[in-house]
């Protein structure tokens, strides 16, 4: 089975548009936001139009539906990664995710496999966003 970039692009409606001088859109700022395929756009539209409520914040039907969808997504991600559901966290951005990892490593108990020691080094490139340093 071969990988077809053209077929993947068809799943993302934003890539049907052109930008300056009629050039095809190429989006490389995925750290800031990710472009959405039709499956995500449709799922979000369905959620916001039929089930929108705060997750884990209410005892009414919409809150239960929202919570079930949220926890269902967690189960799917855990299964995909071969992880336990309680090992999966959702964050709002790449920066928040990187900060969560940094805090977890910085606060890990000595002897924990994620604990940093004085002899450890963290290597980053000049290309890293300032928020990730």
Cite the ranges covered by each PLM segment.
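Pyridoxal 5′-phosphate
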Residues: 1-133
